[in-house]
UniProtKB/Swiss-Prot annotation:
Record carries keyword DNA repair: no
GO molecular function terms attached to this record: ATP binding; metal ion binding; protein-exporting ATPase activity
Membrane topology of this protein: Peripheral membrane protein
Protein residues bound to ATP: 85, 103-107, 493
Top-rank taxon: Bacteria
CDD domains: DEXDc_SecA (cd17928), SF2_C_secA (cd18803)
Coiled coil: none
Protein name listed in UniProt: Protein translocase subunit SecA
Organism: Streptococcus thermophilus (strain CNRZ 1066)
Subunit structure, as described in the record: Monomer and homodimer. Part of the essential Sec protein translocation apparatus which comprises SecA, SecYEG and auxiliary proteins SecDF. Other proteins may also be involved.
Length: 849
């Protein structure tokens, strides 16, 4: 282990030497740039663009370009990047993670690689964790970029598509990670290229990169629409059931936070819902509601995982920032289960129209880089998932902060009393204190204790984040006491007030260790910025969640031996700190494995998503007649259906083909059973199914030609073809996403049967994808053949399709005339009326049976 650490340190030192060499080359241009007039310095941008067009690479332009930005920053912003900031900029340009401590000027560092990469004209995205920081940084740094002749755009969620398009067309675009992801998904739901807002993804520089690419990695971005509200009753019934259970009826796995029914719980469920077998295939949907109700009632904790707003809404609490996540909902029905648990109105369940994880979103950029104060602990993940190295950048001044060893108490009460005593001592002498908590309820408890102790303070948590930047900025003033949930206010520096340096600087007190060392380091990093003095101290108890989940029995035994009766006894030792870090490493390993598994599942969907999106883009951008594509779909549908029926008894097969032809290809009186028998040269022993395929294809071609003649112009024909294909593809893709979600839940259970869930998911999802392609082609065929075609205004078609594209649809199976097919009288072994050639129980009756 020591050898590995030594090798890592040596590699970092070697990298730093290379960076210093390039940085010195940048610095060598300083005098030459300073001698230029404003106009001459500004003209450098156009010169660089021309040199790039003539074949010079960005790497070759780097020293001069960085020097131009340094001189421009001095003239426009009054700031001149240090050598360590130049080094950080080089790391970012190379597509790696620059680990720079708090207060080292990451925002200014970013200007150099952003400017250089904007020279290509392909666009640069600067990604921030919230819109406040996007607007702040775009305004402050935008002055410099504009002065140098580059355009700057801000992409906000409130902007119209036209405004977003304008922002993305700028040389440099500031945006949040979620908005870039949602825009990508929405771009792949439009029906015309001119409605897309993004350009091809070129270079992204992500601020607080660990927050976006690590903490948010398991969070999918989802565009969805409502489904029937009748299912809401099932949420209430499932909630009522799980509230009747005792602790013996279910099992919770604390490390993984999973829950499931025991045998007694299963028996109670079967009795409650009047079932013979809870896990029969017919009850898959019900078990999903029960699982969510179990999680909502026994895993998800109020004021930790979510809060109930005064407006009776469930608001998610971000576990890494402590902020409420406005507009975000737990997916897959969990949010509705929590609403049922808390007795607030259950909102309509939604159906996913498009989704993508942050991991696959950002891996689509040609080049990706990021900045953070704490990335080294996650270096393996950055390298393996994103192919990014983490390079620690030296501080401009030596760090003076004193990090004290952890203090461990036996109970929460003893720990919190000690925290208040420490705060009181520091407050009395005027030293500012920042108290970090991991949960809203802890913030509220400490706040109450400080009030009782007569200590004035500010509270910054998920219930009060509007003023967070202002509160954090003042947290370094003399006598200031601030309670902050986790890393609320991240991105805003804490500057020390007058006389605070002499008092020892800002003291950061952690009331609990987070499961990630990185989050603890972020809290510590709020103190001691730019070489200022400071302190950090963590208070722990054996009742903390991390200690309960992974705490060493050795620590518990030491406490018991010291004094079993005195809960105020405290342990302070390096051994304790090492034990805690060992526990954190285990949790980090579990979390990494989970994120890696999420990526493995999403990679399957990514491949399918890219195929569908590429096909959509081809249709959207097509200036040609799409007749060859549609006729090919019709032919494949005919061949697939005839082949499917040909495996049945001869009489049944011919009747099935006849039903298909009448329902999907031609008017009912245009074909008979006798026609098929004649064409198929039917004898008692054989049928020429190939001849039937040719016959049906000829009939379909004739119908297609008649349908198209109803449209009077080439433009109208292309418009109809595009609308037809896109509406069907979008509907089927939405259903497919939902089916993949259900499949993922189902295969997860197969791990218990010694099957590899990922392999099962890959295999079955591929088959489902093939089935979806077949369903798309069938629906295009049927709609093309059976639709009542007439000229519509372009605006009407736009309105109709845009409604579908946003997922705001009610899905149902309808015949070509828009009438719903009546499935109520179809037997389970009858052929499905949709004409697929499958038996009803294996087709549209699958959910019913």
């Amino acid at each position: 282990m020591a050898n590995i650490l030594r090798k890592i340190i040596e590699n970092d030192k070697g990298e730093i030497k290379k960076l210093e060499k390039t940085a010195k080359k940048v610095e060598s241009y300083a005098d030459a740039m300073a001698a230029l007039s404003d106009e001459e310095l500004q003209a450098k941008t156009e010169e660089f663009k021309q040199r790039y067009q003539n074949g010079e690479s960005l790497d070759q332009l780097l020293p001069e370009a960085f020097a131009v930005v340094r001189e421009g920053a001095k003239r426009v912003l009054g700031l001149f990047p240090y050598r360590v900031q130049i080094m950080g900029g080089i790391v970012l340009h190379h597509g790696d993670v620059a680990e720079m401590r708090t207060g080292e000027g990451k925002t200014l560092t970013a200007t150099m690689p952003v400017y250089l990469n904007a020279i290509s004209g392909e666009g640069v995205h600067v990604i921030t964790v919230n819109e406040y920081l996007s607007e702040r940084d775009a305004t402050e740094m935008g002055e410099l970029y504009s002065w140098l002749g580059l355009s700057v755009g801000i992409n906000l969620s409130s902007k119209s598509p036209a405004e977003k398009r304008e922002a993305y067309n700028c040389d440099i675009t500031y945006s949040t990670s979620s908005e870039v992801g949602f825009d990508y998904l929405r771009d792949n739901m439009v029906v015309r290229k001119e409605n897309m807002v993004q350009r091809p993804l070129n270079f992204a520089l992500v601020d607080e990169v660990d927050s976006v690419l690590i903490d948010e990695a398991r969070t999918p971005l989802i565009v969805s629409g409502p489904v029937s509200s009748e299912t809401n009753q099932l949420y209430h019934r499932a909630d009522a059931f799980v509230k009747t259970l005792t602790e013996d009826d279910y099992a919770i796995d604390i490390p993984t936070k999973t829950i499931g029914l025991n045998d007694s719980g299963i028996d109670k469920a079967e009795e409650f819902f009047n079932l013979e077998n809870l896990y029969d295939i017919d009850n898959v949907a019900l078990t999903h509601y029960i699982d969510n109700a179990l999680r909502a009632n026994y895993i998800m904790l109020r004021d930790i995982d979510y809060v109930v707003s005064p407006e009776q809404e469930i608001l998610i609490v971000d576990q890494f920032t402590g902020r409420t996540m406005e507009g975000r909902r737990f997916s897959d029905g969990l949010h509705q289960a929590i609403e049922a648990k808390e007795g607030v109105p259950v909102q309509e369940e939604t159906k996913t129209s498009a989704s993508i994880t942050y991991q696959n979103m950002f891996r689509m950029y040609k080049k990706l880089s990021g900045m953070t104060g704490t990335g080294k602990t996650e270096e393996d993940e950055f390298r393996e998932i994103y192919n990014m190295r983490v390079i620690p950048i030296p501080t401009n001044r030596p760090i003076q902060r004193i990090d004290h060893d952890d203090l461990l108490y036996s109970t929460l009460d003893a720990k919190f009393r000690a925290v208040v005593q420490d705060v009181k001592r520091r407050y009395d002498k005027g030293q500012p204190v920042l108290i970090g908590t991991v949960a809203v309820e802890t913030s509220d408890l400490i706040s109450k204790m400080l009030v009782d102790a007569g200590i004035p303070h500010e509270v910054l948590n998920a219930k009060n984040h509007e003023k967070e930047a202002h509160i954090i900025m003042n947290a370094g003033q003399r006598g200031a006491v601030t309670i902050a949930t986790n890393m609320a206010g991240r991105g805003t520096d804490i500057k020390l007030g007058e006389g605070v340096l002499e008092l020892g600087g800002l003291c950061v007190i952690g009331t609990e260790r987070h499961e990630s060392r990185r989050i603890d380091n972020q809290l510590r990093g709020r103190s001691g910025r730019q070489g200022d003095p400071g302190e950090s101290q963590f208070y722990l108890s054996l009742e903390d969640e991390l200690m309960r989940r992974f705490g060493s029995d050795r620590i518990k035994h030491v406490l018991e031996r010291l004094n079993a009766d005195d809960e105020d006894i405290v342990i302070k030792s390096r051994m304790l700190t090492r034990q805690v870090e060992s526990a954190q490493k285990r949790v980090e390993g579990n979390n990494y494995d989970t994120r890696k598994q999420v990526l493995q599942y999403d990679d399957v969907m990514r491949e399918q998503r890219e195929i569908i999106y590429a096909e959509r883009y081809d249709v959207i951008t097509a200036e040609r007649d799409l007749e060859p594509e549609i006729k090919a779909m019709i032919k494949r549908t005919i061949n697939r259906t005839v082949d499917g029926h040909s495996r049945n008894d001869q009489e049944e097969a011919l009747k099935g083909i006849l039903n298909f032809a009448r329902q999907a290809l031609v008017p009912e009186d245009a074909i008979s059973l006798e026609d098929l028998k004649e064409v198929g040269e039917v004898t008692k022993r054989s049928v020429n199914y190939d001849a039937i395929k040719v016959y049906l294809t000829e009939l379909a071609d004739n119908v297609y030609d008649r349908q198209i003649k109803k449209l009077r112009s080439e433009e109208a024909i292309r418009e109809f073809q595009k609308v037809l294909i896109l509406m069907v593809v979008d509907n089927k893709w939405t259903d497919h996403i939902d089916a993949l979600d259900q499949l993922r839940n189902a295969v997860g259970m197969r791990g218990y049967a010694q099957n590899n869930p990922i392999v099962e998911y890959q295999s079955e999802s591929f088959k489902m994808f093939q089935d979806m392609i077949g369903a798309i082609e069938y629906d295009v065929t049927r709609t093309m053949m059976k639709a009542q075609i007439h000229e519509q205004s372009r605006e009407h078609v736009n309105e109709r399709v845009s409604t579908t594209a946003t997922g705001n649809i009610q899905a149902h199976q309808a015949d070509a005339n828009g009438q719903e097919i009546d499935f109520s009288k179809v037997g389970r072994n009858d052929f499905c009326p949709c004409g697929s050639g499958k038996k009803f129980k294996n087709c549209h009756g699958r959910k019913q049976f």
